[in-house]
From Swiss-Prot:
<dbReference type="InterPro" id="IPR016169">
    <property type="entry name" value="FAD-bd_PCMH_sub2"/>
</dbReference>
<dbReference type="InterPro" id="IPR003170">
    <property type="entry name" value="MurB"/>
</dbReference>
<dbReference type="GO" id="GO:0071555">
    <property type="term" value="P:cell wall organization"/>
</dbReference>
<keyword id="KW-0274">FAD</keyword>
<dbReference type="InterPro" id="IPR016167">
    <property type="entry name" value="FAD-bd_PCMH_sub1"/>
</dbReference>
<comment type="function">
    <text>Cell wall formation.</text>
</comment>
<dbReference type="InterPro" id="IPR036318">
    <property type="entry name" value="FAD-bd_PCMH-like_sf"/>
</dbReference>
<keyword id="KW-0131">Cell cycle</keyword>
<keyword id="KW-0285">Flavoprotein</keyword>
<dbReference type="Pfam" id="PF01565">
    <property type="entry name" value="FAD_binding_4"/>
</dbReference>
<dbReference type="GO" id="GO:0009252">
    <property type="term" value="P:peptidoglycan biosynthetic process"/>
</dbReference>
<keyword id="KW-0521">NADP</keyword>
<feature type="active site">
    <location>
        <position position="302"/>
    </location>
</feature>
<dbReference type="GO" id="GO:0008762">
    <property type="term" value="F:UDP-N-acetylmuramate dehydrogenase activity"/>
</dbReference>
<keyword id="KW-0133">Cell shape</keyword>
<dbReference type="InterPro" id="IPR016166">
    <property type="entry name" value="FAD-bd_PCMH"/>
</dbReference>
<dbReference type="Pfam" id="PF02873">
    <property type="entry name" value="MurB_C"/>
</dbReference>
Length: 319
């Protein structure tokens, strides 16, 4: 009889690193929704070179995902096969250089806005209301209040899936509405952002006005993943934004299991306490169907969905 050899654990197939490499890491505690299964492995690189060396040396059949603070992310209940990369302290720097800010990709958007305010640099106030890190903001061309990352990026640095480092102009990043054109396996490591001189008091006043507007209109203290769907092309939606289409479809307050469409802002899904990732995703798909039925508009997920369901299957991550 031929003895069957057990498969080699993923962690033992990965290259040596200077950062932290761990197996079977719970992801639910780090996501804003507080749902989802574990990462098969997680890598926290010591610095950009450690990240590049890991990507260059990993087996080509091992999938890689990067997450920040998981504020706009839904991890499915079966977890994430392969390696989840989470940039840490080495990527959190924010330095003012003239009228620019040199930032690591793991710096919080809100922190960058505060540093800009303290330096008397305007134009970055909108970042104060965007949850998450700059890496995620670059990846999705995050924006609010008629401003977006494409308006302030001078250049960015990234490492591709083969471990090669790149310095990119905005044109090379191919920004569009809530998207950039870089391949999914490229990982942003930093960027340079442009501001313009202004009075600190005026900047602070604008940021406070934005904070008050968010408090009044969004469920900031709920377990939520931020805006669920991107606003559709105005030419296709008659100028209506995603929340207006959702409201018109009768979905405000709609529930499925432990998931609910927010009563306060119906482009937000909420974990009421006992939701699974499957509840949240199914509710989102129900909303999409109802909007299509009532308005003919196909809403596109803005929340990134990763991993596999408990049935071992993975649904689409976009659309």
């Amino acid at each position: 009889m031929i003895a069957l050899r057990a498969p080699t654990p993923l962690i033992d197939r990965l290259p040596a690193v200077r950062g932290r490499l761990s197996a079977d890491v719970a992801l639910a505690p780090v996501t804003w929704f507080r749902v989802g299964g574990p990462a098969e492995a997680m890598f926290k690189p010591a610095d950009a070179q450690d990240l590049a060396d890991f990507l260059a040396g990993r087996p080509r059949d091992v999938a890689v995902r990067v997450i920040g603070v998981a504020s706009n992310l839904l991890v499915r209940d079966g977890g994430v096969p392969g390696v989840v990369i989470r940039l840490g302290r080495a990527f959190t720097g924010v330095e003012v250089v003239g009228e620019t800010l040199v930032c690591g990709a793991s710096a919080l958007d809100a922190t960058v806005a505060k540093v800009a305010e303290a330096a008397g640099l305007a134009g970055l106030e909108f970042l104060s209301g965007i949850p998450g890190t700059l890496g995620g903001a670059l990846r999705m061309n995050a924006g609010a209040h008629l401003r977006e990352m494409a308006d302030i990026v001078v250049l960015a640095t990234a490492v591709d899936g083969l471990g090669q480092s790149h310095t990119l102009t905005p044109a090379q990043m191919g920004f569009s509405y809530r998207a950039c054109a870089l391949p999914e396996d490229w990982i942003f490591t930093g960027c340079v952002l442009a501001g313009r001189p202004d009075e600190r008091g005026a900047i602070a006043a604008r940021m406070e006005a934005l904070r008050q507007a968010r408090e009044a209109s969004q469920p900031l203290r709920a377990r939520t993943g931020g805006s669920t769907f991107a606003n559709p092309d105005p030419d296709l939606s008659g100028g209506r934004r995603a929340w207006e289409l959702i409201d018109a479809a009768g979905c405000r307050g709609l529930r499925l299991g432990g998931a609910q469409v927010s009563e306060k802002h119906c482009n937000f899904l909420i974990n009421t306490g006992e939701a699974t990732a499957a509840d949240l995703e199914a509710l989102g798909e129900t909303v999409r169907r109802r909007v299509m039925d009532t308005s003919g508009v196909a809403l596109r997920w803005e929340i990134k969905r990763i991993g596999i369901g408990l049935d071992g299957l993975s649904a689409g991550e976009n659309g």
